[in-house]
Amino acid sequence: TFDIVGTYKFRDASVLAHMNTLTYNPDTNLLYTTNAMVDGHRITTIDADTMSIGNTITIPERVFNLAYDKKTNQFISIVPIDATMRRINYYNSQFQLILSKDIDAHHDNYNNNGAFATDGETIFATLSTVVTVDKTGNVTKISSFPKNLEIEDMDMRHNIMYTAVNSNHKVFIYSMLNY
């Protein structure tokens, strides 16, 4: 089941407005989110126990969708360059840039949602595809889904990928069993 375990209201729009990505670092016990609509260089931390807003981290590169890879201890950001190209930025746990890789998402729209990373692999969504990038920064898989569904973010549990999907202002949780 999908139960609400707490409701938190944040009023600082400059920090948390339009936060469409959320990732967790178990080593710091912090959630990390971005607000690219206001400042595309800003990352905000939230304490996972208290849900209090923490520090704001500003980095030189734009950051849109963000994932933490607990196996490599790296943050990964997926940033649209143009309608088809995305820049994958790899950061250490202190948000120092390690590597950037430009990839062709084979999609004709800037929209870029969701991010998941594990053991060097990165998964993100465009408006109608899910894209997998391997450890070397090469696209290894692109899977289509209906255009009327918009994946907002994703995570994995017991080797099943779950996605939060926006459809006509309603949110649905989908599982992708064969991903």
Language-model segments: residues:
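Structural motif
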Residues: T1, D39-T45, A83-Y90, S128-D134, ...
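Hydrophobic, aromatic-enriched interface-forming segments
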Residues: R62-D108
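Blade-loop segments of beta-propeller domains
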Residues: D3-N35
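Short coil/turn segments that connect the beta-strands within blades of beta-propeller domains
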Residues: D27-N29, K71-N73, D119-E121, H158-N159
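Loop/turn-rich, solvent-exposed surfaces of beta-rich toroidal or solenoidal domains
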Residues: A105-V133
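Conserved beta-strand positions in repeat-built beta-propeller and related beta-rich domains
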Residues: L31-D39, S77-A83, I123-S128, T163-H169
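A short beta-strand motif characteristic of beta-propeller blades
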Residues: D3-A13, S52-T58, Q96-D108, N138-F145
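Repeated scaffold domains used in trafficking and secretory/extracellular systems
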Residues: S14-T23, I59-K70, H106-A117, K147-H158
